[in-house]
Amino acid sequence: MKRNPHFVSLTKNYLFADLQKRVAQFRLENPQHTVINLSIGDTTQPLNASVAEAFASSIARLSSPTTCRGYGPDFGLPALRQKLSEDFYRGCVDAKEIFISDGAKADLFRLLSFFGPNQTVAIQDPSYPAYLDIARLTGAKEIIALPCLQENAFFPEFPEDTHIDILCLCSPNNPTGTVLNKDQLRAIVHYAIEHEILILFDAAYSTFISDPSLPKSIFEIPDARFCAIEINSFSKPLGFAGIRLGWTVIPQELTYADGHFVIQDWERFLSTTFNGASIPAQEAGVAGLSILPQLEAIHYYRENSDLLRKALLATGFEVFGGEHAPYLWVKPTQANISDRDLFDFFLREYHIAITPGIGFGRSGSGFVRFSSLGKREDILAACERLQMAPALQS
């Protein structure tokens, strides 16, 4: 049996797995210290009571011979698709265009597999490392990094002389924590239409947006229906990280170059490759959408971001993002300090684990990412430790 040649292009370990190994090793060698882990974007708040009740009720029905059921619909429960259309998208996306899945990362892999190998894929730099790995695993012909630099407010730089087939775009962004405004998103949509580019828009953090003028969906730009697919997730807002539930939107207007409708092929693709998301997860998702605008967990994580930002600024760092995303993109004031050295410094001196920016791409060099998804007591303890960071000041 021959090895899949695409594995050769991957690094030995996935970024976050490697970081957790380093943290575990530090804990093993330094049992006297308590490490606060702000390096991963994992949720810490429990399920809302009404969501947990819906989940439990669904499981109870599966345990009864009179109410149990087998496979659900391949494309998702009609009630969940309809509620997303009405409550989340306010009618700008039809229920038939929404396809329920087992999470955003799985859908990203399905989509890049669906469009096939030999595509030229453009990715924001820095970006969530799964984009790069999945593009490699699915046989991308070329992967183009779009620098998102501080001097451009982390807005991607687009080439004028390079053909792109697929653009992976994330807003609110992971890792920079920044969000595109409507004018910026409209400009990207028009660029994509002009250059015949498909946008895969990752909106997994859209529920963190508190400013009503900022777009939560790419389909707030009407022309995006001709060039974009949107991916979203219940993981962060509802605490479904371990439950696995997400969705993808395929507009009915979206076509290939030959005029064939993408949604028709997607339905055929899912019928072959996916038997539908967990029914209890979907029924819990319906309950979650009813309380999403008032969800306490989102406010909790925003408050965490505010606490971290104040502590980091007081320490002398430059801080970006965090207002509309659970991530803060942080630049040390000390010159000539590498990402790895900064990671080790925090772990060694303050027993705080963060994510080195270089792990998200070359343009992440000189930055680190803080996650605000931790427990409040850990955030407060981290803020207290950050007050003792004179060694990092210029």
Swiss-Prot record:
Catalyses which reaction(s): (2S,6S)-2,6-diaminopimelate + 2-oxoglutarate = (S)-2,3,4,5-tetrahydrodipicolinate + L-glutamate + H2O + H(+)
A Gene Ontology BP annotation from the UniProt entry: lysine biosynthetic process via diaminopimelate, diaminopimelate-aminotransferase pathway
Membrane-spanning intervals of the chain: none
Cofactor: pyridoxal 5'-phosphate
Keyword terms, alphabetized: Aminotransferase, Pyridoxal phosphate, Transferase
Keyword set includes Transferase: yes
MF GO annotations: L,L-diaminopimelate aminotransferase activity; pyridoxal phosphate binding
Positions of substrate binding: Y14, G41, K105, Y128, N174, N275, R369
Top-level taxon of origin: Bacteria
EC number(s) stated in the UniProt entry for this protein: 2.6.1.83
Annotated residues for binding of pyridoxal 5'-phosphate: Y71, A104, K105, Y128, N174, Y205, S233, F234, S235, R244, N275
Family affiliation: Belongs to the class-I pyridoxal-phosphate-dependent aminotransferase family. LL-diaminopimelate aminotransferase subfamily.
Role of this protein: Involved in the synthesis of meso-diaminopimelate (m-DAP or DL-DAP), required for both lysine and peptidoglycan biosynthesis. Catalyzes the direct conversion of tetrahydrodipicolinate to LL-diaminopimelate.
HAMAP family: DapL_aminotrans_1
Subunit structure: Homodimer.
Protein name: LL-diaminopimelate aminotransferase
Species assigned in the record: Chlamydia trachomatis serovar L2 (strain ATCC VR-902B / DSM 19102 / 434/Bu)
Gene from which the chain derives: dapL
